[in-house]
Structure formats: C-alpha cells, structure tokens
C-alpha cells in the first residue's frame, strides 16, 4: 500500500524547502546542468563513495524513429560502449562501464550508499545530447540505478468502529449488482496483478469461505513470490469479491527493483504479460518513485510497452498514491515540513497510457447503498489520495477541455477514484484475521474488478475489449445521459481540493458501474463510428 505513516504538517506544504549543495569540482565537457529537486535530495541524503566502479551501467535514449540507430551504435563503439536496441523500437539503451559513460557524456558518475544501505550509481547532472548524435537521438535519460519503490506494509486496524464493506456491500455501493444479477461475474476474463509480495493460500480460502464465494488459487508468473505483506492479499481478495469467476494472475515484479535498468525491466515485464494475457485487465498497487526523479526518455520503454498492451485490448489501472499529493516526499524524513519540491505524482500512475486511481472515504447505509463520498485525507496519519499535475507529459487529447487553474498543458492525475479510507474499506482476510483494507492500492483493484464486469458486458453487447479505456471514460463523462460517476466535491489532500467535475484529488469520481458500462459501450460505438469501422469489427 502506498502510504507513509509519520505525521506531517499539512498546513506547511507551501513552504519552500531550500536544498543546499556544495560547489562542484567536476569539469563538464557538454554543459550538463545540475539536477535539482527530489533527485538532488536523494543524493544529498546518501553517502558519496566517489567515482563509480560499476562495470555495467546504462542510460536510456529516445530515437528519432524506429530504424536501426547506426550513428548511435558507431558513436558508442568509439567510446567503448555498446547499444542495446530491438528492431521497431524508438528507444535504446547505452551500456558500458560507469567511467566510460561518464567520459562519453561528460558528466560525473559516482557510487552512493543510500539511507537504507543500498549502493547505487548516479550522476548529479543531466547528460545532454552530444552533437554527433542529433541525427539519431532525440532525448537522453538520467543516470541513476536506484529508484525508491512503493509498497509499505499495510496496517489493517482490528478495532475499527465500522465492520467494513462486505463483497455484497461493495457491489451495491458502486451499482454493480445489476451486472452481477445479469450473470456478469468475470467468466472468461483475466485480471493481472503486478506485486512485490506474495499471498498465503489460507487467507484466500478463508476469505472465499467467509463470503460463500468459490475458492480460488491465483496463477503466479515470474518465479516464487516474496512473503506476504498484505498488498497482494488485499488486491486478490477485493477483486475476487467483485468478479469471483475471473481468472486471477500475480506477476512477480520484485526483479524490477533489483539492480539498474528499472524501466527497461518494467517494459519487458509488461510485454511478457501482454503476450501471455491479451484482452486482460491489469491492476498495479505498487510504485517506482516520484516522476521528478526521472525524465521522459527514461520511461519511453514503458510507454511503448503500454501502447502495445492497449493494442491487445488490455486496460491498466494504477494506484495514484497515499501521500496526499506529496509523492515526491516519499519515504524521506517526515519530521521536516513538506515543501514545493515534495509535491508531485507517481511515475507510472501518471503515464497517459495508465488509468490512475485516487481514493475516497465512502459512506453507505446498512445495506451498502451509496450515501456520500469524499476525497480521502487523514492528516494525523499523513495519508490521503494523491494526485496532481505531471511535469513530464503533455495534456493527452482525452483531457482536453478540462480547466485546472495551475496548469493548462500537462497530464492530470488521477483519472478516477474509489474507496481508500481504511476506516470505510473492504473486509478482507490477512494472517487468518478479519481486517479492513485501505489505500489507493485498494481503490485500484476495485476499479480493475469492476472493469472486468463492464468488459464482459461490453463484449456481450457487440463491443470490443475496453483496452485503452481513458478516452472512453472521459468521453462517457462528457456526453452521457446516464450518470456514470459519483462526482466527489468534498474533502481534499495536502495540495488540492475536489470541485464539481474533474479534480486533482478524485479525478472524474467513483463509478456508478451499471450506468458506466452502458456509457462505455455507447462511447466505444461513437469512437468506432468516428474511426470509420463498425463496433465489434476489430
């Protein structure tokens, strides 16, 4: 669960955090600028071990096209480096010894020991594009072999004042019961979860037995999973509560945070999952750091992979984060007041190809009927729904027309929301005990599970796999007669407040599922007509 539990001073979020840095002693050959913000803070909090001794370092470059980058390959060879590139890709990886990369790009590359003992290499400066490569290369990534990942051990209170949502209450609250009653329970659908931890089959069995659901054993891809910490268990049980007939798969993502090349590993992992499970629904409740640690070139492989996944009919949901809009503060010392450099969004959740899911506090009656919903914020616990404005990505077409006072040109997150407050969350079983789930890492599998039902409905009524769902969600929000979302207008986080329509805390809102399923089918048909082919025709 993306949450950090040390108390923060929400009122201090607009204070400026001054980052002191000593004078540079490195001579630069290409005028590479010093990287500031959270990247500089990460290095400042680490011990500089001197020039890197890494024998296998890398950085990502984006290419002008998908043809073989001959100039780049020749240049790298002349600098004792290599290029890793696959035909058809518009990005490549420059690899070699750290000192060779430092010399070639004219930047220092040092080894660092982080606050938790991890050793990594990094350059405090942004490599610039060598003039000799301008015919092939359009962008150069950062040199950094470590990204702080997000998956804190969830804390499920045993003494909450409410019993939590049962599976039936969850379906009722989000108006999914009409779909279930019509027979849409996930049969023939596949839900894929990407996880850093594992699950205990005894928990899953107890959960299924408690609620008279069919027992289930998820398929595991990518090798043995780490011991359960609560995240994977919550994801699986929440999804099974919604779509008990769906096939559930857990992909072991831990290798992506071991060593360098994180985004290359993520992209290859996504490519493999897309090949194995076409037309599936993906749910991510983990994170790979604040986007201010990277630049657009670094994540180009992941964006390419997700675009290919969309072509296979895959929809992707990711938790926006639990730091109340302060994703760039991350796991750093919460005894210091947050400042502007701490405001930011999660790297993967902010990608335009991903549906980012924020969090709410949900109020229902005794039968689970929706009564009210507010943006989730818990000041004493330093938690809340994350969201904000991307620094890296232009405003996607599907968000054109949305008015946000502090930005007009960039990607906005989250896209949607669901219950995340652990005091109003879903009843689950963890450690053979009843618990209440929470966090946006609960909200993401809720949306993924509900999308399984909607996908099944759309297919059964002449549509296509929902796949790249964001354009459909925004089209449905703009032009449908049936209300498809609960518009969240109260609550807030450390940075923004919700308001009527789209906002940076809860996006378009939480789902009114049966209505939304019909609206998505209508939006898909309208999209198909505009594209010049018949719905259901591919």
Where are these regions (language model features)?
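Substrate-binding/charge-relay-adjacent region of secreted/lumenal peptidase catalytic domains
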Residues: 21, 26-88, 93, 98-359, ...
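Short glycine/serine- and small hydrophobic-enriched flexible loop segments
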Residues: 448-456
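An often Trp-containing, charged/polar helix-loop segment at the C-terminal end
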Residues: 361, 402-403, 455-504, 524-525
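Non-catalytic alpha/beta scaffold blocks inside enzyme catalytic domains
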Residues: 344, 351-381
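Ser/Thr/Gly/Pro-rich low-complexity, disordered linker/stalk segments of secreted
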Residues: 531-538
């Amino acid at each position: 669960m993306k949450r950090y539990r040390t108390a923060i001073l929400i009122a201090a979020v607009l204070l400026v955090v001054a980052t002191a840095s000593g004078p540079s002693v490195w001579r630069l050959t290409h005028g590479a600028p010093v990287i500031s913000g959270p990247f500089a803070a990460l290095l400042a909090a680490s011990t500089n071990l001197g020039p890197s001794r890494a024998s296998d370092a890398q950085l990502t470059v984006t290419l002008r096209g998908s043809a073989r980058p001959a100039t780049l390959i020749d240049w790298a060879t002349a600098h004792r480096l290599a290029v890793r590139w696959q035909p058809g890709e518009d990005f490549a990886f420059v690899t070699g010894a750290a000192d060779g990369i430092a010399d070639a790009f004219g930047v220092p590359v040092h080894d660092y020991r982080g606050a938790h003992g991890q050793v990594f290499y990094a350059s405090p400066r942004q490599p610039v594009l060598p003039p000799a490569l301008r015919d092939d290369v359009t962008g150069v990534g950062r040199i950094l072999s470590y990204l702080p990942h997000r998956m804190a051990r969830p804390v499920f209170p045993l003494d909450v004042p409410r019993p939590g949502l049962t599976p039936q209450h969850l379906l009722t609250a989000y108006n999914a019961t009409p779909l279930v009653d019509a027979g849409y329970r996930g049969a023939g659908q596949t839900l894929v979860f990407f996880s850093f931890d594992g699950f205990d089959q005894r928990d899953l069995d107890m959960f299924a037995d408690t609620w008279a659901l069919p027992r289930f054993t998820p398929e595991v891809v990518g090798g043995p999973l780490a011991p359960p910490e609560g995240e994977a268990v919550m994801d699986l049980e929440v999804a099974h509560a919604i779509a008990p007939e769906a096939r559930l798969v857990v992909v072991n993502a831990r290798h992506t945070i071991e060593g360098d090349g994180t985004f290359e590993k993520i992209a290859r992992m996504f490519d493999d999952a897309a090949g194995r499970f076409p037309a599936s629904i993906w749910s991510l409740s983990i994170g790979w750091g604040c986007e201010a640690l990277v630049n657009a070139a670094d994540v180009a492989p992941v964006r390419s992979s997700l675009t290919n996944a969309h072509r296979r009919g895959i929809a992707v949901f990711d938790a926006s984060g639990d730091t109340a809009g302060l994703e760039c503060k991350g796991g750093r010392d919460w005894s210091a007041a947050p400042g502007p450099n701490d405001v930011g969004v999660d790297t993967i959740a902010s990608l335009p190809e991903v549906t980012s899911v924020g969090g709410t506090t949900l109020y229902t009656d005794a039968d689970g009927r929706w009564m009210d919903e507010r943006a989730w914020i818990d000041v004493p616990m330093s938690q809340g729904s994350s969201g904000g404005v991307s620094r890296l990505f232009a405003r996607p077409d599907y968000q054109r027309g949305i008015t946000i006072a502090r930005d007009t040109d960039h990607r906005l997150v989250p896209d949607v929301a669901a219950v995340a407050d652990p005091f109003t969350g879903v009843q689950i079983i963890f450690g053979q005990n009843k618990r209440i789930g929470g966090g946006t890492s609960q909200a993401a599998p809720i949306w993924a599970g509900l999308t399984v039902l909607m996908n099944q409905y759309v297919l059964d009524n002449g549509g296509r796999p929902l796949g790249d769902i964001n354009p459909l969600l925004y089209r449905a929000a703009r032009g449908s007669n049936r209300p498809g979302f609960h518009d969240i207008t109260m609550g807030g986080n450390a940075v923004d407040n919700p308001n009527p329509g789209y906002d940076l805390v809860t996006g378009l809102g939480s789902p009114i599922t049966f209505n939304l399923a019909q609206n998505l089918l209508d939006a898909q048909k309208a999209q198909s007509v505009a594209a010049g082919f018949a719905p259901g025709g591919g």
